[in-house]
Amino acid sequence: MKVLAPGYLAEASLTALASGCQALSTRPYVPRGYSLSRRNDSTPIYKDASYCIDERVDDLLARMTIEEKAGQLFHTRLMDGPLDDEGSGNNAHNSTSNMIGEKHMTHFNLASDITNATETAEFINRIQELALQTRLGIPVTVSTDPRHSFTENVGTGFKAGVFSQWPESIGLAALRDPYVVRKFAEVAKEEYIAVGIRAALHPQVDLSTEPRWARISNTWGENSTLTSELLVEYIKGFQGDKLGPQSVKTVTKHFPGGGPVENGEDSHFAYGKNQTYPGNNLEEHLKPFKAAIAAGATEIMPYYSRPIGTEYEPVAFSFNKRIVTELLRNELGFDGIVLTDWGLITDGYIAGQYMPARAWGVENLTELQRAARILDAGCDQFGGEERPELIVQLVQEGIISEDRIDVSVRRLLKEKFVLGLFDNPFVDAEAAGRVVGNDYFVRLGREAQRRSYTLLSNNEDIVPLKKIEKSTKFYIEGFNASFIESWNYTVVDSPEEAEYALLRYNAPYEPRPGGFEANMHAGSLAFNDTEKARQAKIYSAVPTIVDIVMDRPAVIPEIIEQAKAVFASYGSDSNAFLDVVFGVSAPEGKLPFDLPSSMEAVEAQMEDVPFDTRNPVFKFGHGLSYANPCASSSSKCS
């Protein structure tokens, strides 16, 4: 089934001109009550699609003031709602109309849930109308963090809402099927384009070599070869073989690999600012980025962290010229856009929590000096900031040349032309409601949820539960009784009353304070002693089947030992769990990382070295199947 992106036609093509340039030929969708200006003798070159893209960029750049150029270098959040809304208190912000009309900004990250595709498309169309009313009419590029799975944490991702719902990236890695990854990316692209989103702030290709890190669920696991293989399909699914009007551009992150954070703490926070390489293994973490560049990655984002104990200066990667210019651009040959992670210049708030600027290693620099340092490092655009006046000041004071600004602005404008935004930035809002979350897309997501389940243990082949009576009684935790009752089984109040127990648990973590920080699952990977004792009573009372949501590699040897069967899942609903338990679907997943045997083993392993944990309970690649329960290298089956 092929669903065309609203506002664009399948026959849209790139026409080669005699000059060797490429000109864009499209038949635009235009919202009712609005018209795109027609070409005439006075049409500027940059608005004339018969010219090649490089000529159009040159023409536009020559017309821009330094203030208009400065606005292009900023990419910040966009909140759904009135365009003149400025928020209040800790959520105060410049209004959208101010950022577009006064600050000349044209890159925004949609930072709110999408609950109605048509309304979101209409909202983005209104933003494009506002942008076209400015002096030069530069269209807006709207981006998003991942929003096709189960994670809800402003700053890292959103639940699917009206979009089709799939496993997290770590679940696609468990499935190990390049075709499914490509299909996911193509579906997500169609749904993004339908509402007007043209930039994906993903994939996250960090290697999960530090199992305590809070951001593993959006990675592809611990293995660089598997990560590299799958990310190629991911990028090509979003962008196509070449970036164009049918593409959603991707932002590959977090260079040079965000996984080896010291003690597993995340560098959003000052206590997690260090990235360490005790195994001298930086090269391993670069492999996915090399694959991404070869696959056509057009934009790369460095992480917040600062390297310690290496040949590099211990300053955050976006401030680090040897990382951005010498390593990424010169050594790896990347000539695309480098977008910083969010909030490196200005202190601010995320989810109501105060967050100092993540200027690790250069905290003592002024905001102006930080901006200059980032540009000098080789970055093009400031994420999560809305401070064009700093760029204007840098140029006016002779600290940064306007020619240097032009280098980055040229990259950013060219991307807009390649995406076709200058020729038609609008989408068909009514069609968006038909494309987003359509039955076919939803079915594909549900199939992937079920297939990605990983069967870790299956004592006495207890699963699938196929030959049980309708009078069977279940004790459950972690999901609503209505899911079981829809199968016409009975839910009871205690394990002692039940014939089976079905438990769904999140992987263990230590709760943290704060609005944003509280959503980051960090700290210990093991349940505390009180919780272990509570669970043990269930396992001793009734045959128990456990599903652990593996957003991180859980330390659960006691559950493997005591429960009858244990699954790992990576983003799935309760219907998917029950379909796998009752044999409607079969688990096909393989572990995308090692499962450590203890926290002592976790603490002893080197942060930058994959598969460095001592005596893992299960190794990378473990996964049983219903057809052949011992189809793995696990000693449990020997």
From Swiss-Prot:
Enzyme Commission no: 3.2.1.21
UniProt-listed InterPro entries: Cellulose_Degrad_GH3, Glyco_hydro_3_C, Glyco_hydro_3_C_sf, Glyco_hydro_3_N, Glyco_hydro_3_N_sf, Glycoside_hydrolase_SF
Group of enzyme by EC: hydrolase
Signal peptide extent: 1-18
Active site: D341
Domain of life: Eukaryota
Pfam families cross-referenced by the UniProt entry: Glyco_hydro_3, Glyco_hydro_3_C
Keywords, alphabetical: Carbohydrate metabolism, Cellulose degradation, Glycoprotein, Glycosidase, Hydrolase, Polysaccharide degradation, Secreted, Signal
Glycosylation sites: N40, N94, N116, N223, N274, N364, N480, N488, N528
Pathway: Glycan metabolism; cellulose degradation
Catalysed reaction, written as an equation: Hydrolysis of terminal, non-reducing beta-D-glucosyl residues with release of beta-D-glucose
GO molecular function: beta-glucosidase activity
Swiss-Prot/TrEMBL GO biological process terms: cellulose catabolic process
GO cellular component: extracellular region
Protein localization: Secreted
Record's keyword annotation contains Secreted: yes
Family from the record: Belongs to the glycosyl hydrolase 3 family.
Role this protein plays: Beta-glucosidases are one of a number of cellulolytic enzymes involved in the degradation of cellulosic biomass. Catalyzes the last step releasing glucose from the inhibitory cellobiose.
Name of the protein this chain belongs to: Probable beta-glucosidase C
